[in-house]
């Protein structure tokens, strides 16, 4: 459907219930990687079914390790089945981008989030937060690229920052 929002999650209810995976498939290749990520969570939940309801759900870092592992399995399978050098190069660039986003970008999100909480407690405005975010973006990318000014508002597009405080630390 045109205009459909992307998004996905996996919900492991209890040890004896097959996990639910929700994925809004928009027809983009990225959706396949998202599915691999969520299926990583699902497989992890299924492998934990011998646990009781109190120990079934893992900590966020462990859960995200399983989901990123799902992405790596997909990447390995795509690389092994592809013969075109240019497609393989594209796959490698996407893998590097994903690895950077999974590790470094998440660390910068957490850094911003910690600073933002302190700033809000001191009465900071959204403009103050945007300026701080932009400073961290420029620090993150250094001289490797010029960060357009409108990216100061990117933090508002990251639901984890305001809907699930400190979720990004798990990566």
Residue spans for each PLM region:
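Cation-handling catalytic/transport regions enriched in His/Asp/Glu
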Residues: 1-171
């Amino acid at each position: 459907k045109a205009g459909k929002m992307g998004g996905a999650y996996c919900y492991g209810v209890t040890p004896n219930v097959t996990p639910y995976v929700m994925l809004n498939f928009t027809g983009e290749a990225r959706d396949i990687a998202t599915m691999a990520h969520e299926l990583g969570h699902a497989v992890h939940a299924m492998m934990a079914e011998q646990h009781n309801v109190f120990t079934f759900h893992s900590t966020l870092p462990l859960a995200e390790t399983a989901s990123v592992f799902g992405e790596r399995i997909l990447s390995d399978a795509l690389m092994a089945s592809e013969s075109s050098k240019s497609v393989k190069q594209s796959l490698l660039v996407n893998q590097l981008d994903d690895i950077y986003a999974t590790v470094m970008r998440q660390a910068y999100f957490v850094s911003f989030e910690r600073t933002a909480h302190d700033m809000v407690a001191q009465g900071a405005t959204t403009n103050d937060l945007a300026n701080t975010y932009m400073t961290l973006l420029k620090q993150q990318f250094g001289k490797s690229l010029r960060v357009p000014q409108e990216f100061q508002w990117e933090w508002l597009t990251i639901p984890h920052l305001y809907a699930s405080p400190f979720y990004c630390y798990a990566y």
